[in-house]
């Protein structure tokens, strides 16, 4: 069965979120940046806490570094297990892509990107000092992130 998500507007233009043809009120929370990188932590700490809070939806970070640990090789097993856990807990997910930048830093890029500062050059501070953040002018980095995000989007449709 194909799941449907849409916003239906009334005669005044006010929208209501519908999930599978039923109105849906998001009672949501957002996970800490790295919480979703550990299945056992999610199992023991996060899902029980979300239930205590009577949430029905969680914004779940998906870090590029966990999807493409080796360039061009995509592994969605962590995400697939998180989706399985969420379904078991009757929790809706809103997936947040952590790609090249999160809060202005390149914290969640794969190791192969972090190690190759020639191909994925860093931004510099005003005085010329090198930062650890990949430059938004680095076309190689933007293309690599876009490729990974495209695979992610196809996988999660």
Q: What is each residue range found by the language model?
A:
Residues 12-14, 28, 103, 117, ...:
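Feature targets compositionally biased, intrinsically disordered low-complexity regions
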Residues 42-122, 153:
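Aromatic-lined substrate-binding rim segments of carbohydrate-active enzymes
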Residues 1-55:
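N-terminal carbohydrate-binding accessory modules
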Residues 26-38, 61-79, 124-155:
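The substrate-binding groove and active-site-proximal loops of carbohydrate-active enzymes
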């Amino acid at each position: 069965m194909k799941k449907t998500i849409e916003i239906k507007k009334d005669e005044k233009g006010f929208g209501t979120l519908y999930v599978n043809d039923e109105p849906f009120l998001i009672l949501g929370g957002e996970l800490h940046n790295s919480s979703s990188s550990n299945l056992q932590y999610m199992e023991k700490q996060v899902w029980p806490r979300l239930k205590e809070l009577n949430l029905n939806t969680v914004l779940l970070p998906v870090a590029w570094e966990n999807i493409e640990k080796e360039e061009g090789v995509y592994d969605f097993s962590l995400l697939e297990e998180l989706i399985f856990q969420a379904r078991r807990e009757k929790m809706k997910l809103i997936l947040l892509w952590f790609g090249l930048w999160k809060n202005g830093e390149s914290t969640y890029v794969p190791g192969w990107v972090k190690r190759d500062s020639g191909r994925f050059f860093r931004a510099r501070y005003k005085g010329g000092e090198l930062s650890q953040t990949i430059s938004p002018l680095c076309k190689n980095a933007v293309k690599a992130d876009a490729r990974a995000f495209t695979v992610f989007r196809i996988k999660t449709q």
